[in-house]
Amino acid sequence: MTANLLNLNVDTLFEQHSVSEIDEVHKKIQSVVENKREELRTHVGERYRDLLQAADTIAAMQTSAGTLMEQVRHVQANCRSLNEQQLLGFQSTANASAKDAALKERNAGKKLQTYYGTMAQIKLLTALPELIWTHLDNDRFYAATELFIFSRHISTGLQLDGQSALMQKLPVARKQWEILRPFHVTIKQAILTALEREELLQEMTVDCLQSLLLLDKSDLSTVLKSFLNLRSSAFLNCLQSGPSEPRRVKDRILASLNVLNSTVELLDKCLLGYSLLFSRLEECASSTCPPSINRMESSERQLVHLLPEIIAGFKPQFDVPQLTPEQLGSSLQQWLDKMNALAAAHLQQVFALVTNMQTIQDIKSAARTNGRPDFVRLEQQLHLKRSQLDFYARKYVPLINARVREIIRSSWASAMKLTYEQVLLLIEAGQSQPPLQIWREQSDDLPLSLAAALSDQPKRLANRTKGYDGATIELCKRFDSHLADIVQELNVMLQEQTTRAEDKVSLIEFLRETAEEQLTEYLSNLKGLELRERPALLLALRNSLALVELCPNLKLCFCQPSSWRQWTDNSAGLGIEHWQRICGLIEKEMLSFWLVIVDDVLAGHNCEEKLPKVINHEVVLSDFALWQTLTLEQRDEDQEQSVQSTIRIPSQPRLSLQTYLHQLIQALNSVVPQTLPPKVLQAFIQRLIGKLLCHYEGLAHAECTKASQNIALQLYFDLKFLERVFAISREERTLYDQIHAQQNQLRDYIDPFDFELFAEHITAHVSRAASRLQGELGVLTPSAAAPSQGAAAASSLAHEADPNVLCLSSSGSTSLWFPLLPIVMPQAAGRVTSAERKSPIQEPVEKTATTTPTRKSGGNGARKGDSSKSKSSAASFFGMSQEWFR
């Protein structure tokens, strides 16, 4: 049966069963309930027999006590009746009637007074709601709280007389209390809302704290905890900005700082020592404090004579609390820890909305204007850490500095990202103009005025010589404008007076580190593209190198302006070192791009394919240029008759070599129409000479070269020509040793006596050929300083100030206004030399002249020629007019 009842669906019982079935179910349920009761009684009776006996005993005692009390009441009634009967014979009838009349009159007056007092109290209850609302609207919270406590006191007294006949006829008293009861929550909510305000005065704070002490009868530590929690809520509310009331970020940050400072100041003025709150509590607890009825309107105060004394003289009672500095310090320390967590979570989010330095400067200026309170005394009294209460220095200044850094980093990253994207677009679009367009004359190539010529703006003609087209110049202009904004915003912060000197130095260093980091990342991204096409490589390296040359504000990020050096002291040299380092890094990375182009050009024009690998008679006839025939006249010491001999020496390099160099120049000009930087040219020449030396090494080991002195002499001439044209010096030790080793190898294939005769003339022909072909070699020709400076002349990728522009007027030591002095000397028969040209090969010539009899007359002639040449040079030099030197 029980199982059936448990499975019974109560929801469908009256829908699926008839009345008789429902009645049967009801009986079964009652039967089960009775059985359970019996089982419970049996179970309780067996296990808790003593408890049942105690309960029965208590019930019996209650009955006995009730009977005893009833008997006592009967005894009292009998005694009172007996007393009246005993005194009845001694009283006269007249006196009894007078007393009865007085008693009745007194009872009637008492009832009337009770009636008027009750009506006056009800009148007060009806007037209190409006009065409480008035005080709440005027932010007089303690007055509203005192009136609410007064109304509760009145209502409590009326409820105690609720069984009287009068109160039974006046239910309005109970209803009026139902109206006044919600004021407890209303007043408390208004107090809590007031304590959450941003601007909170001392008087209002004391009013609210006193109201909380009176309203909930709380102790002062609980009220202090509530006050600090509400100030935390006020701090969070300051940081919010709703859609209905949007607030500026600066206002929100300053308001939050004001809340923190004002909270500590209120604790100092209101709760520490004999402060305003404790003096107010003593006034309320003193006997001179007026009763609460005095807060009523004048019409209600006129009814005070009708009120009972307990109502008319009512006033709130206070026990003046005590709050030690240790308790206040402990509560304040807990609140500070909480505020640190809130500031880390919410204040940083608000600072993240600051987008420019001007807002930060306004925040710092406003914080300085509002003043920073000095809480040193309070920290000492409450045993807090030093500067623990300096919220601006501990919480806001670090966030300000962090935000300044983030603005610099984000601005730099945005500018660098935009520049990188524009470079990618230029690379994808390819060359916007034909290569030869760079050298076409345009109207805006030269400045149209002296002011334009003297300005710091990049000159268009100079930029075109470096391959910088309009798109590149525009890209650099945009990037430089972004950097100018960053420098200007940072300058605003540095000019701000409240910023510490160490913070200013830190910001300057951070700007330099950020610039270096962003440029390094840009180069890494550009290198990660793994460009292989020549136009793409040229666009990438041109735009990257242009950033250094056409963006003056980029240098300011490393080398500080003069206005910043008052804070950096000796770190200006360090900034120059960082600038040189980043320039070197850019040049190094761009040099790798240049080398890819150079290797590609050399791979497309391999000397092994362009030059003949074997020199036979056909190659000699087609490749060797016409040699020059010279007649030498020699005279012995004993014979006056001279001996003439004819020699043939090369006058220019092989035609295939000239053709190869010409084709290489054309290929290079088609790829790179602008001038090559010295370092790139040096790398190109080194690679080219390396390949040519490998080719000539193969020719030097060929049997045809070993068998033919003419072939060896022509190859020797070619190597001397390459050494002279490409200015291979001892500083380039590897190439220098390699080319001289091959020259010595080819020299071994030539007859020593013949080579002694050829050496001086070969040197002269090499110089003449180099001078004649130097213009044709064009871009392959190194700079004039290359022979003397070697690799040091190409230590930088930066172009000369004015490449490919004639020096019309200059006072520099390297620029000549006049050509070299002419040297007048008689030409010896068959000798083509100059006075200033001395080669290492001349020494063995002179030695041979002294040892070989056939060369004696020639040696004397040379010495005579040298002496006459010196005299002629000196005469021509000192014979000039002094007007030439002016």
UniProtKB/Swiss-Prot annotation:
Complex and partners: Component of the conserved oligomeric Golgi complex which is composed of eight different subunits and is required for normal Golgi morphology and localization.
Q: Which cellular component, as a GO term, is one annotated location?
A: Golgi transport complex
Composition bias (Basic and acidic residues) maps to 834-846
A GO BP entry: Golgi organization
Query: Where does the UniProt annotation locate this protein?
Result: Golgi apparatus membrane
Compositionally biased residues, Polar residues: 848-857
Assign the protein's first listed, main location to one coarse class. Answer: Golgi
* Pfam families according to UniProt: VPS51_Exo84_N
Provide the alphabetized UniProt keywords: Golgi apparatus, Membrane, Phosphoprotein, Protein transport, Transport
Region (Disordered), start-end ranges = 834-886
Q: Which gene encodes it?
A: Cog1
Report the family membership: Belongs to the COG1 family.
Query: Superkingdom, according to UniProt?
Result: Eukaryota
Write the protein's name. Conserved oligomeric Golgi complex subunit 1
Residues that bear Phosphoserine: 839
